């Protein structure tokens, strides 16, 4: 059992180190093969001549007005539908 845990821990550490090393290689520019600093990319052009801009995703804030609770068969029987949604 100890050997099994040790092997799983080793595999997990290998996966984490590979993930960290590949995330460091990703940059916003084009890297040279000789490990020179990244050259920033120019924005791509759309056919009508306008520059393509990157839009950041917007998060929606949802306010919960009623407390959430678990559905019981009694709640469903009284209301006739599921009140949890």
UniProtKB/Swiss-Prot annotation:
Disulfide bonds join 71-84. Highly expressed in the venom apparatus, and weakly expressed in residual body. Its main location: secreted. Keywords: Disulfide bond, Secreted, Signal, Toxin. Coiled coil: none annotated. It comes from the Eukaryota. Residues 1-23 form the signal peptide. It is found in: Secreted. Endoparasitoid venom toxin that exhibits insecticidal activity against Tenebrio molitor pupae. Impacts genes related to immune response, environmental information processing, metabolism, and response to external stimuli in T.molitor, suggesting its involvement in the intricate parasitoid wasp-host interaction. This is Insecticidal toxin Vn1.
């Amino acid at each position: 059992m100890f050997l099994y845990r040790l092997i799983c821990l080793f595999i997990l550490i290998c996966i984490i180190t590979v993930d960290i090393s590949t995330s460091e290689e990703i940059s916003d520019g084009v890297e040279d093969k000789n490990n020179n600093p990244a050259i920033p990319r120019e924005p791509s052009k759309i056919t009508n001549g306008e520059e393509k801009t990157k839009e950041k995703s917007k998060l929606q804030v949802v306010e919960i007005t009623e407390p959430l609770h678990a559905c019981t068969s009694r709640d469903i029987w009284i209301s006739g539908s599921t009140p949890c949604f």
